[in-house]
Amino acid sequence: MSIGVQSSGINISHAGLSRLVDAGKSEQGDKAVRDDGRALARADAALAAVVGERVAARRDAVAGSGAQRVELARPKPDAQTRATDRRTVSGLEREHKRLAASQTPRVTGMHDALVQRHVSLDGAKAAHGEGVKRAAGDAPRAAADAPQRFAFADDKAFDAMLALGAAMQKNVQSDLAMQGKLTMLAHDAMMSAAAQDRSIGAAQMTAAIAGGALQATTSLGGAMQQMKSLSTKSMSIEKELKPQAELKQFHAEQALELRGINKPVLSNDEVSHVKIKRDTGETVRHEIDHGGERMSDEHASVLAQEAPARQHRIDMHGMRHEENLVKAGRQQMKGDLLQSGGQIGKNQIDGASAQQQGADRAEQKEDENAQQTAMAAASTRDEAAHRSREAAQKAIDAAKSQVANDNAVAAQVAGNLRT
């Protein structure tokens, strides 16, 4: 047992006084209860004698300066506060086990230091229980002689509590910094996901514009080829079919003349000739037989010679018309191919755009997952920091309570000494 006088620098250590005090706790049963009062009385007497002698000597030495005030150091708490101390530290230990891995090493060391100071107490209790089983008479004396330390009754323990609070504050700052980083990561992931959305929209717009332009171009080219095909057919009808029809009509008329049908006859004014205009524009004059029964031999010979040439021209008009139809068909096919090629190109552009959009969506999913992971990590970090702050607050509250208890005990002892 130690008593320190802080203002005067007195530090008194009395082993006999400790043995007298501890002797009152070594007895059991009714005898322990009876002897407890005598032991406490002897302890008070010894305490008063020792303090009186040392204080009187000190008072004589400083009588000239008028210093009469004596301050006592904080004594150890009694058995009631020890149970409170143990419960408090047990709570700190449980909180320490529940803390996340985000704690700084200094905070963990402070918790371990506080818990370690009470491990010796638990070991002493266990040794006491085993000693009772082995020898009922020797165990109480061994337990009384064994040193017992309580964290909240030691000045170093209070320093540890204060260091714990400071370390927890630093840990809070570290948690805030980490939460800020995680929030920035989540923000960056969100911005990247938004950029992927814009990229998908741009890819869709590009595909739509390119596909539309290609399809419009090929459709226009195909329409122009189809127009050429129709124009070729129209030209063939105008230049080939119409002349062919006129030649066929003239050829039929000449054939009728050769057969004597609708042959020319003399009119009332007795015209002796007739003029025939050929398809070349040349006008040929033929004499008419005054008998009116048949054509002249010269007329029939001319008509017979011109018939094969007219038939050849009729056949050539038909062949050229067929060639024009073939040309128009090729133009029509080219137009259809252009339109089909435009549709195929548009489908290819849509496929490439869909592939790019799929890749962008995959990256977007990755960014969203990264954002969710960062937010979950930030939430976990915040929860761990909250638990750390709660544990630190409990430790600080326990230290404050212990200080108040020690002050009350010191005031009571000082009052007893004055009386």
Swiss-Prot record:
Entry keyword set: Secreted, Virulence
Q: Which residues form the signal peptide?
A: none
InterPro entries this protein is in? Answer: BipC/SctB (IPR005427)
Transmembrane residue ranges: none
In this chain, the stretch annotated as Disordered covers 62-91, 338-402
Which Pfam families would you find in this protein's record? IpaC_SipC
The record's Gene Ontology cellular component field reads: extracellular region
Basic and acidic residues bias locations = 71-91, 380-392
Q: Which domain of life is it from?
A: Bacteria
Task: Provide the protein's localization.
Answer: Secreted
* Family classification: Belongs to the SctB/SipC family.
Q: What is this protein called?
A: Effector protein BipC
Q: Which organism is it from?
A: Burkholderia pseudomallei (strain 1106a)
Gene name for this UniProt entry: bipC
